[in-house]
C-alpha cells in the first residue's frame, strides 16, 4: 500500500478552529485529502495503559524504517501543518480504521498502517507495537524513530482462528505521547470443503522467523539484471509449540533454521547490493503458521507464507531445512510471488511425523513412571542473551511415601556458575489444582543437586487427568517450563492414587559409555561370553542400587549422577524393578497373540523408549537365541519375578521386526530374529513381534532387551496355534460329512403335468448351515462341486461368493440340484476352500425314486446348446443339399451339352449321307424317321389275330430309359429279352428317304493310321440261326471276321426292335440297315465321313467287376462300364442273352443244304421267339431288288424255320431284342461285309484274318455300324425270295415264349420284367464302332464252304477279347481275299499284343449263333458286329458300331476256312493291341489263321432246340423284374441248352467241332449290382398301336 499523500497548500487557508471543531467537515471540504483516510487524527495519551512486551511473542523481524528522506520543502509544509493542527499532541494514522474484511480461518492477510509525525520540532520514538487479541499480529518494533514531520509504516497481520467478527485494538507505545490505540477489525469464516461442509480449523500458532543473512550469487548478478539471493531464516519456537514441534524442528538451541533461494529482478543495478537487499526486506514479509493435529491428519505441520508488497518480480526457487533428523518432511513447489497484494502466498509446508511414532504408546508411557524432567525454554533467545544448553539443567520428581498427591522437585545444576531461581508459579488454569509448597523466595543454586520445592494436589478422591506446566524464572533471563501430567491411578491396595509424569526430563541412571565399558559393545555378537558380560554388569548395577537406597544426603556417585537423599530409609521390601528405569513403557506388558492358524503369521507391536538424556543402544532378540537362555531367565526372575515354568526357552515361533506404521514405512524384518536399535534421549521406537505357530496349542516366551542403560530388560509374549474348522449341515468334513437331499415322490409327480418344452425345470433346493466351530476367523473364498466353481453335475450353489465367518458364527448356503433323471442315486463332492488354502470336503447325496425316472426324464429339457446345435446342423445339411443340387445341375447341363453335340454330329452325318447317296449306315434321327416308318409302312397291324397266327407287321420297339442300367458283371442275366422281328412282307411303297441303303459292294477306302476308337470291345455270342446243323453249334466258334455280315443287314435287323435302333452315335457313324429286299446304295464319301466319326472313341475310366467265374481273365477283369464314358446321356443298349439261341438251336429242324430247302422250312423253330415270320407271299418287290443285290455280291438271306412259336405270336410282330446280360459286359464285334467284285452268283462270305495290325483301321471306319439294328432286317437277309423264313430267338427270362397278350398287358407299367434293348428309350442312340475288314491276303476261297451246309456257330461265353478299333485296315476296292492267305503272319505278329493300346475292354462271346449257308459264292465278311449276348453290353462305348447286328446269318460254301481248333474258344480271346477283329484263342496265336487245306467238316445239322429256359414259368410280380426271376435255377443254363443232335453228314464232325455251352450263370443272385427295370415309357403308353407287345417275356420270330 502506498504511503499517505501530503496536504495541499490550499489546506492551510483553513482556520485551525474550524478544523478542531468539525473534523468531518474538514474531510469533506478538503478535496485534496486521501479518500477514506483520517489525516491528522489525534489520539490522546492514555496514562493508565502500561507498556507490555511479551517475550513469548518477541520473535523479531528486521524493523521497517521510517520515511525520513523527505525533502526540505515538504517537511516545512508538514511541520507547519502539524503545528497548526496538533500542536505536538500525537501521531496521525492512515487509514483511520483498519478493516481486513472476510478472511478464511488459518489464512493470514496483511495490511500497512502509516503513522505521521505532525510535529515540526520533535521526533517521536515508537518503543513497541502490540495487540490485545491473538488474531492480530505485528512484527516487533524496537525504538523506531519518527522524525519531525516524518512518517513510518507498520505491517498488521490478521490470522483468524475462529469464526465471526473480530475487533481489537492496536497499541503503539511511544516515548513522548505514551500509548496510542488504533482500531482493527476483521471477519473469520471457515473454508468450505469439496463435500460442502465447513472444515474445523485446528489450533494455529503464529510464528515470525528472523532473517539472519542474505547472500548474493555473484555469477547471477554479473550476467543478468536479476540477483539470486540466499536468505537464511531462523525461528525460535516459543513454549506453546515446544513439545509438539521441537523434536522435529529444533536442534539443541531450539532454533528452526531454513534457507530460501529467491531470484529478484533488479530495477536499478547501479545501486549497491546492501540497498537492494534493504528494499527487498522492506517489502517482503515471511511468517510461519504452526497447526496442531487435525481430525483428518495426525501430523503437526508448519506452513510458510510470504507476502511481497513491492513492484519487483520475485521467484521463489528453493526452500530447504538444516535439520539433521529424518523426521522432517518438506513440501515445496517453486512459485512466482504476486506484487502489491494483501494476502500471503503459501510457498512451503513442513510436517513432523516423529511424534506419530510415539503417540501410540504415549498414554501407556504416562503410567507408573517417574522420570526426571528436562527444562524447556519458555522464552525465545533473542540477541543479547546467551545460548543455553538444555542439558545443563535437569529436574526430577520424587514421590512421597505413604502420601498421595505430594511430590518433591529436585534440580540438578550442570552449569559452571550458580543459578538464582526468582519465582515459581503454575498456569492459571491449574491454580486451584496444584499448590507450590516449601518455596521461600529466590534461591541460589550452585552446581549440584538440590531440592527446590514441593507440589501438592489440592483435590482428593477425584479422578483427574491434568496437563499443565510449572514455570521457574531465573536471573539469566530464561524461564524454565516443566510440563507435567497428573492423573489418577489405583494403587495396589485399591485406593485412588495420583502419579505425575514428566515429559521433558531424564532418569538418574546412565549406562556406561563405550570408553568406560568396551566389553558390552563386544557382546553384541551373542557368543558364549555374552552372558558373562551381562551378568557382571547386572551385579554391579544391583550393588549400587543397594548403596543408593540407604543414602541420607545428596552426593555424587560413581555413576556420575547426583542422587537425592531421603529423609528416612526406604523399606527393604521395595523391589529393585521399581527403582530401575525400564525401557518398556509398561513393565508388566505381555503381548498376547490370539489364535493363529498354522503356517500363518500375526504381528503385534510394542514401544521401547530411552528414558535417559544419553543415547542408548539396544539389542532385542527372542530368548531362544540367547547363548544361555536358562541363566537369563533366572536373572529376570530375580529382578522382575518372571514365572519360569510357563516360559518356553526353545521355541522359534516368535520373530522380531522393526516398523513404524505411522510413518507409512514398510516393515523391516530382522536378520535372524535379532534387532539392533539406537535410541536418542527420550526417543521411542516401535518393534513388531511376528508369531508363526508351528503346532496347535498355547506357547509363551520372552523377548530380551539388552541395553547399555539397565543391562537387560524383557517383555513377555504369548500365542496360540489353532486350526480352522467348519461344519456344514451339522456335519464335520470328511467321510462322515454327507449332505443328503431328500426328494419325495410328491415332488416328482409334477413331471406328469410338465411339458418338455416348458421353461420350468424341476429342481430341488436345500439350505445348509455353515458354522465356524474353531477359534480362528475363516474366510471362504470359493465353493466347488467336484472341482467346478459354484456349480457342476446338476448342483449349483446360490449366492456363490466369498464370505467370512468369525469364531462361533454361522451362515446359510443354498444348494440347488437339478436332476437329469438318468440315475436314481447321485453322489458328488462339495468343497469349501478358505483363504488359508484349506479345503473342507463334504459329500452331496441325492436319492431319487427309481420308478419315476422314465417319467421325469421325458420332461427334462435339453441342454442350452441343443437348439443351436440343431440349427447349425440343419444349416450345414441345407448347404450340402444345395451343393448337391448345384453339382447335379452342372452335371445335367454337361450331359445335355454333350447330348446336343452328339445330335448335331449325327444330324450332320445324316444330312451328309442323304445328300450324297443311299448308304448302309443311318443316323439316329434318320432311324427315327426311316427305320420306324419302314416298319410301320411294311408291317401290317396284327391286332385281332389269334395266338396261332403270324403277325402281319413288325411292331415297334418298346422303349425304356437305359441310363439306369450299368453293366456290372459277366454273370447271370435275369432279364426277359425281347426278340426282334424279321420283316416277312415288304410293301410296295419303299421308303428310300427314311431308310439306309445296303452297303456298296466295295468298302470305303480305309484311312491310314489307327484311331483310338471304342476301348475294349466285347464279343457277344451270335444268335442261333434256324436251319443250321446242331453239330455246328455244338463247338464251332465263330471268328470275329465271320460275324462281320453285311452291315446293312445287321443294322436293319437290330434297329427294328431296340431303342438303340435310333442309331445313337457318340463318336462313330451309325447305320440302320434294312432287309436285303430294299434297294439302298451307299456312297464311298459317306463311308469316309463315318470313318472320321468313328475314330475318336473314348476310353472308360471305371472298370466294373466281372463276376464270371469261368470266363477268361480278360473277360473277368477288364469289363468296363463303357457306356457312361462314350455317350453323354449314359445309355446302354442291352444284348439279348444267348440262352435264347441255345434253347432255340435245340428245337430247330435240320435244313437242307440247298437254298430252296431252307426257304421251304418256313415254320422251323430257330429260337423261342414270339413273332411269326411273314410268309413269302407278303414280301414286297423289294425282294427282287434284294435278290439282285444278292447276285451282285451281297450276302444271301437265310431262311430260318420258325414254325414252333407261331401259335403264340399271332397278334404280335416281335422285334429282335438286343439285350446285354447284367452278369458280364460282352460285346461281339461284327465286322462289316466287304463287298467284293465277285460274280453275282457268289454268295459265300470270306472269313479272313487281318494280317497287318497296323492296317486295321483301314477297313473303312466310316462303315461302322450301330449294334442295335433291327433284327427283322437280319431276317430279311436270311430269307430267300419266295420263301418264308422263320427264325426264333429264345428268351431267358423264365417265361414261355408263347405268353399270352393278356399277361403282357397285366404287367404293363409295372417294374416287373427286365428291360431289354427294345424297351430302352426311343431317343437312345447306339454307339458305332469302326468297321472291320480282313486283310487282302486273308480271303477265303469260294469253295471253302458249301452253300447248302448250314453252319451253326456256338461262341462260348469265355471268348473275351478287348478289341481295338484304332486301326482296321481294309482294301479300298479289291475284295477281301480268302482266309488262308495270311495265317502265318497273324500267328507270328499276333493280332493284338496286350498292352499296346489303352486298357481295352474284354469282348466276351458268350452265346452261340447259327448261320445257314445258302450260296457257294465267296463273300468277304464285314468286321465282327455286336451280337446280342447273355451279358450287358455298353453299346455306347467300346462296341459302338462294331457289331451292328445281333445275327450274322452266313451263307458259306466252304467249311475249310473254319478249322476245328480255331472255332472253339472256351477260354476267351487275348487282348490284341491293334487288331481285334479276329478270333484269337489263348492257346493258339492265330485263331483263324489255319490253312485252307483243313478239311471241311461242315454239314447240314439240324438245330436241335432244347426246352426253353423255364418255358412254362413267367413272373407277373413287379418285383420279379427288380430282383430277377426268383424261379431261376442255380444250375448252368447252357449245359442243357446246347445239346447237339447231328442229323447231317457232318454230324460226326460237328460233335468234335462244336463246343458245349459253358456255364454262364454261376448261380442265382437277385441282388446283382445292376438291374434293368422294365419301365414303360411314354412312347408305349401313348401309342395304343405300338406294335411290340409289352410282355416282358415276348420273343419275336427270327
UniProtKB/Swiss-Prot annotation:
Keywords: Glycoprotein, Membrane, Phosphoprotein, Signal, Transmembrane, Transmembrane helix
The keyword 4Fe-4S belongs to this UniProt entry's keyword annotation: no
GO terms for biological process, alphabetical: negative regulation of canonical Wnt signaling pathway
Stored Pfam families: Ig_TMEM131L_2nd, Ig_TMEM131L_3, Ig_TMEM131L_4, Ig_TMEM131L_5, TMEM131_like_N
InterPro entries tied to this protein: Ig-like_fold, Ig_TMEM131L_3, Ig_TMEM131L_4, Ig_TMEM131L_5, TMEM131-like, TMEM131-like_Ig_dom2, TMEM131-like_N
Subcellular location(s) of the protein: Membrane
Signal sequence interval, chain numbering: 1-40
Transmembrane segments: 869-889
Phosphoserine, modified sites: 1112
Compositional bias segments (type: Basic and acidic residues): 1146-1172
Top-level taxon of origin: Eukaryota
Membrane topology (UniProt): Single-pass type I membrane protein
Presence of the UniProt keyword Phosphoprotein in the record: yes
Carbohydrate attachment residues: 343, 438, 592, 648, 708, 845
Annotated family: Belongs to the TMEM131 family.
Official protein name in the record: Transmembrane protein 131-like
Organism listed in the record: Bos taurus (Bovine)
The gene coding this protein: TMEM131L
